[in-house]
Regions:
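Juxtacatalytic substrate-recognition/specificity segment
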Residues: 157-280, 371-374
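Extracytoplasmic
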Residues: 81, 96-98, 118-120, 129, ...
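Short solvent-exposed beta->alpha transition segments
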Residues: 30-33, 39-40, 51-96
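Surface-exposed, charged secondary-structure patches
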Residues: 73-118, 249-251
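Acidic/His/Gly-enriched intrinsically disordered linker/tail segments
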Residues: 229-236, 256-257, 275-403
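C-terminal motif of bacterial Sec signal peptides marking the signal peptidase cleavage site
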Residues: 22-25
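Short beta-strand edge/turn micro-motifs at domain boundaries
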Residues: 111-152
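Bacterial N-terminal signal peptides that target proteins for export
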Residues: 2-14
């Protein structure tokens, strides 16, 4: 869900002659000079944070911001950061000694991220005696909160996982790490293609806090036990995805349900490099559910109760669910039927054509340059069938498994 951009630090925009004269008359330094000075200050701030040098970190803070900023510094103490840096993108001189800066913050969790996670920050600064100080630091217009801005982060390391939580008991974080550790080999068995083989899980304190991490109202995710964020079609330098747990919905599940959730989300992490805008949601979500239920012994009636009710009531779906059917915040029963139908489509492929063909089909769809024709081409080339015949086979499969 995240899209990142990288670029050299440059001042964007065009200033009018009047504005330039006004700044010059006030004795303001040239914009490029201010950008360099601000970048240097932020570089020092980043080095101090990585070194856990609180005194050096505080040097660039205005007294009005210092208490809040030093709290965030403390909140990050347990996070195993491998890198942390800022790139100044734009400096807006709002007065003789004032500036507002748009900067890209990039950070990497050591041992998990091959590339930095990036997010935009907006910083207000004041200049005193030739030095710049940060007076405010907030997310950019389209940026979400970061976990450490919500409280002290507790880190629990599993054998194949890192769980970062705020406001959660340690035993709960350890249980999530154990489930994530079990998920990784299960996913590797279902998805034999190379992937990182590890997962980062974020556990915020509440549903609303989860919404803050996703830049959306928490109510949008009510009833959703977890989601995964990351770059679609991330390259080898893309950061690891983040699995974000909804502590309320996840907490009401039993051990089996919790394991299914984490295996499902870990599957998204594993398949990310093969997932692209050409991949329909039914395939990405259906495959993740197929991988999660694989080998558990659960029947279709147990795993697809909403769709079973519909089929038994004579409401057999006419077509595979479209992307809109998977939108959060709508009819919960309809959403469940979409997931269940997608899972059974992938189960059909695995049973009729084989598991290797299912993963080959997934990769073939994701490799297509666009959504148009992606599924049709993969159905023909990998499975030797047509959309019409596959849909008919899927509907028959639903009737046989759920009727």
């Amino acid at each position: 869900m995240a899209g990142q951009g990288r670029g050299a630090a440059r001042r964007a925009g065009v200033c009018s002659a009047v504005a330039l004269l006004a700044l010059a008359g006030c004795g303001a330094p040239p914009p490029d000079s201010a950008s360099r000075e601000i970048q240097s200050m932020l570089d020092r701030r980043a080095r101090a944070l990585l070194a856990r040098d609180e005194a050096a970190y505080a040097v660039g803070l205005d007294t009005s911001l210092a208490p809040a900023a030093l709290k965030e510094f403390d909140h990050l103490a347990e996070v195993p950061l491998g890198s942390w840096d800022y790139r100044v993108k734009d400096v807006d001189r709002t007065g003789r000694d004032r500036a507002t800066v748009r900067a890209e913050l990039g950070y990497r969790v050591s041992g998990y991220d091959s590339g930095p996670v990036t997010t935009e920050r907006v910083l207000d600064l004041i200049e005193r005696d030739g030095r710049w100080y940060v007076t405010a630091d907030r997310p950019g217009a389209d940026a979400a909160q970061q976990l450490w801005q919500q409280g002290d982060v507790e880190a629990v390391r599993g054998a194949r996982s890192l769980v970062l939580g705020v406001g959660q008991p340690e035993e709960r974080l350890r249980a999530i790490a154990a489930a994530a550790d079990r998920a990784v080999p299960a996913v590797s068995a279902a998805w034999p293609s190379p992937w990182a083989g590890r997962v980062v899980v974020l556990v915020p304190a509440s549903l609303d806090a989860m919404g803050g991490l996703l830049g959306a109202p928490g109510a949008s995710y009510r009833g959703i036990a977890a989601v995964t964020t990351g770059e679609v079609r991330g390259g080898p330098d893309a950061p690891a995805d983040r699995v974000i747990v909804n502590p309320e919905a996840y907490g009401v599940l039993g051990a089996f349900g919790q394991q299914i959730v984490l295996t499902h989300e870990t599957t998204h992490v594993a398949t990310r490099a093969a997932t692209s805008p050409a991949t329909p949601v039914w395939l990405s979500e259906g495959f993740a559910d197929w991988a999660a239920y694989r080998g558990t012994g659960r029947t279709a009636a147990q795993a697809a109760p909403e769709l079973r009710r519909a089929v038994r009531a004579g409401d057999l779906p006419a077509a595979l669910p479209d992307d809109k059917a998977f939108a959060f915040g709508g009819d919960a029963d309809a959403l469940a039927r979409a997931y269940e139908g997608a899972w059974l489509a992938c189960e059909l492929i695995a049973e009729r054509w084989g598991e290797e063909k299912l993963t080959e089909f997934y990769r073939a769809v994701g490799a297509h340059p666009s959504r148009e024709g992606a599924v049709e081409k993969a159905l023909h080339e990998v499975l030797g069938t047509t959309p019409e015949d596959f849909t008919a086979a899927w509907r028959a499969h639903l009737g046989a498994r759920l009727g």
